[in-house]
């Protein structure tokens, strides 16, 4: 995840636009679930994955369209034959992908990526917060206890707290919210004092 956001920030610093593809929801049998991410760059190369196969291919192509239109959007894909949005797979699931356009001239987008990287370097609980209006993402920010809600004021901290879970959470409605864990604090237990264990211990 650090590599993905670092590469995005570098592209923006180099004056290049980039699209972040994020799975917001999945049901049935799908390659990856909510929270999977892939960055698509102007030359077509990608960092990260949302599951490979037809979903990733179609998403990469759609991301290149978003780079041209400069408009973020939400797109659903059906992984079952003979259905609307059928992409030729037979898994039987559904995937919703958010294509988020980042413009190198947008300081807010760059600040958001920098804030995400700061949280990824830490070891405290943190979340990505998305607000949905009319089925489209209208705002995105981060939340952690040390800094509170940043980069958006789309929801009050009091209303947000019940949605801060260890798994991705969707609150339907208009507005709706999608809350995704970014980092989760935890402990690692090392058993044994051999060469591997001693190398891992701080």
Regions found by a protein language model. Give the residues of each.
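Segments forming oxygen-rich coordination pockets for charged ligands
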Residues: 1-202
């Amino acid at each position: 995840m650090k590599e993905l956001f670092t590469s995005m920030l570098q592209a923006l610093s180099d004056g290049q636009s980039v699209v972040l593809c994020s799975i917001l929801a999945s049901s049935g049998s799908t390659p990856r679930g909510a929270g999977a991410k892939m960055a698509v760059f102007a030359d077509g190369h990608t960092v990260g994955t949302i599951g490979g196969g037809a979903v990733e291919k179609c998403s990469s192509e759609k991301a290149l369209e978003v780079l041209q239109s400069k408009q973020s959007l939400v797109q659903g894909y059906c992984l079952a034959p003979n259905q609307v949005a059928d992409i030729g797979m037979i898994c039987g699931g559904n995937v919703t992908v958010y294509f988020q356009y980042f413009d190198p001239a947008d300081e807010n987008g760059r600040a958001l990526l920098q804030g995400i990287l700061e949280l990824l370097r830490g070891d405290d609980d943190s979340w990505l917060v998305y607000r949905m209006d009319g089925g489209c993402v209208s705002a995105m920010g981060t939340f952690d206890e040390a800094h509170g809600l940043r980069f958006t004021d789309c929801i009050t901290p009091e209303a947000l707290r019940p949605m801060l879970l260890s798994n991705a959470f969707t609150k339907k409605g208009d507005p709706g919210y999608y809350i995704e864990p970014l980092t989760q604090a935890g402990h690692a237990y090392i058993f044994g004092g051999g060469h591997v264990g001693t190398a891992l211990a701080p």
